[in-house]
Amino acid sequence: MRLTAKQITWLKVCLHLAGFLPLLWLFWAINHGGLSADPVKDIQHFTGRTALKFLLATLLVSPLARYAKQPLLIRTRRLLGLWCFVWATLHLTSYALLELGIHNLALLGSELISRPYLTLGIISWLVLLALTLTSTQFAQRKLGKRWQTLHNVVYLVAILAPIHYLWSVKILSPQPVIYAALALALLALRYRRFRQWWR
């Protein structure tokens, strides 16, 4: 049984809640002692992991729609991508304002260049910014065939973002490895498409 347009609308509502509720939880945790002795790192890791979750969900949509024969699922991809960008922006903001501090924002550029894992992070964010700004139907019409080429760059983010996470942790734990493995698996599902590009 295929999903209807009405069911997709309700699914989008649920996905919006999935994007917004973690923010409410984070505010609650900040104000009610729900974070560890290093709350800045907790906020950075939470926002970064949430961005990664939405990135993986975005990458999951196409193969899921294809294998489950639910073409209307594609309509949720843009929404998931937007939430990925929102959480990636919160992640970047938490580093800039909480780690560096508002009085040291001038150091942000040098920090992003001098620390390789930060360089990967800002490249990923800039790509997400470009994809977000061109995610409208107007941009799709204006860019034509170039639109799909541009939005295929999301696969670069799928590589760089997990590496950024792996590189940023001082002690390797299962979480970043799991995210990297999931990203790799989702990229592997597109093996045939990549082969066509390389020919």
From Swiss-Prot:
Membrane topology, from the record: Multi-pass membrane protein
Biological process according to GO: protein repair
Bound cofactor: record note: Binds 1 FMN per subunit. Binds 1 heme b (iron(II)-protoporphyrin IX) group per subunit.
GO molecular function terms listed in the Swiss-Prot or TrEMBL record: electron transfer activity; FMN binding; heme binding; metal ion binding; oxidoreductase activity, acting on diphenols and related substances as donors
Reported cofactor(s): FMN; heme b
Annotated function: Part of the MsrPQ system that repairs oxidized periplasmic proteins containing methionine sulfoxide residues (Met-O), using respiratory chain electrons. Thus protects these proteins from oxidative-stress damage caused by reactive species of oxygen and chlorine generated by the host defense mechanisms. MsrPQ is essential for the maintenance of envelope integrity under bleach stress, rescuing a wide series of structurally unrelated periplasmic proteins from methionine oxidation, including the primary periplasmic chaperone SurA and the lipoprotein Pal.
Record protein name field: Protein-methionine-sulfoxide reductase heme-binding subunit MsrQ
Species of origin: Salmonella enteritidis PT4 (strain P125109)
